[in-house]
């Protein structure tokens, strides 16, 4: 009986310390890879069998938009969409940090300053 318990204890310990891998990212295979580059823009697509995906399109003016996604180590689906244009790179996604709200005292101070513009000084030399 003691040997029986010891065998199961060793097997349980081995199972507990064995590395668990959701996927083998090193050996991931590309399922889709396409690229279409034209005089008026481009389109690209990438799909990998480990849940990584990427798509992008661009136009003749240098603007681009697209998306990329993957599964985080915590198992969360991460999805980022973006636009890149004259206003810069603008990503959007639930996992991206957002700035904290402006404190109420600052909001009130800004509203007061807007409601009470400073009068120009007479006689000031510029």
From Swiss-Prot:
Pfam families: Chitin_bind_4. One of its GO terms (molecular function) is structural constituent of chitin-based larval cuticle. GO terms for cellular component: chitin-based extracellular matrix. Residues 39-100 form the Chitin-binding type R&R domain. Residues 1-16 form the signal peptide. Keywords: Cuticle, Signal. The keyword Signal applies. Component of the larval cuticle. This is Larval cuticle protein 2. It comes from Drosophila miranda (Fruit fly). The gene is Lcp2.
């Amino acid at each position: 009986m003691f040997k029986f318990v010891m065998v199961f204890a060793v097997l349980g310990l081995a199972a507990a310390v064995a590395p668990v891998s959701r996927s083998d990212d090193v050996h991931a295979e590309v399922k889709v890879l396409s690229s279409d580059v034209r005089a008026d823009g481009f389109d690209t697509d990438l799909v990998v069998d480990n849940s990584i995906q990427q798509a992008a399109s661009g136009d003749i003016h240098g603007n681009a938009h697209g998306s990329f996604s993957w599964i985080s180590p915590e198992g969360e689906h991460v999805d980022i969409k973006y636009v890149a244009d004259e206003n810069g790179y603008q990503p959007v996604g639930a996992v991206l940090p957002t700035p904290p709200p402006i404190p109420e005292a600052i909001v009130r101070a800004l509203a007061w300053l807007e409601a009470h513009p400073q009068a120009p000084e007479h006689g000031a030399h510029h």
